[in-house]
Amino acid sequence: PAKIIGIDKNADIAVIKISADEDLNPINIADSNSLKVGDRVLAIGNPYGIGISVSNGIISATGRDYGNPYLELIQTDAAINPGNSGGALINENGNLIGINSKIYSNTGAYQGIGFAIPSNVVVQIATQLIRFGEVKSLWIGNFRVSSITLKINEKITPALRIIEMEKVGPLHEKGIKVNDIIIGINKKESNWNNLTQSLRFATLGENLILEFYTFSEKFKTHEFEYTEEKT
């Protein structure tokens, strides 16, 4: 029997507590921050329900955002198919470096681009789920962005276009929509690094100031108070 301790829907990670009849040997967890492009890896899973399988590959990239400012992923060419999600991504020493998460594919099947949640992020999420039963992260809504440039007052400016957003949370409540463009973050340049830093290293109760360019109202500024993520 197993008991669910907590779930983080954004990362698609859950912690369960099981009652085992015998002692289990936990996997050793490696530091995912030490990963390098080209490192050899193995992906473990149950593709298409055919049974436990192992595929091999390399680290193709690290820090892949997939447009999600709350999560950076490991990219690998190890075969990850439906049924592999939730399986371990391990290094050559058999240590956990990530949890297989998703693939980029036009067909829904393996095309050489798979993603895993880094082990350090998994530990951080699991620790909060065990302590609090939920993830207490700083949250202004669930959304994805892409980097663009925008010409404002004859000046080329870096910006972030919202390409996907759920209709829940502070962004939605302020009337922000898909295709609205973030042109400033806390009075700084609007780029991926500033967005992720502002979300990860803020304190509850602080405010986030985002400047937008929209095709309906042109320029507008919104202030958001950081709140805990609602899972």
Task: Name the predicted role of every residue range.
Residues P1-N153, T157-P158, K167, K174, ...:
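Serine-dependent protease modules
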Residues L171-N194:
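Conserved PDZ fold ligand-binding element
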Residues T221-E225:
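Edge beta-strands of extracellular beta-sandwich domains
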Residues E206-L208:
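Exposed beta-strand face motif in extracellular beta-rich ectodomains
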Residues I97-G98, I183, F219-K220:
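Generic structural signal for well-ordered beta-strand positions
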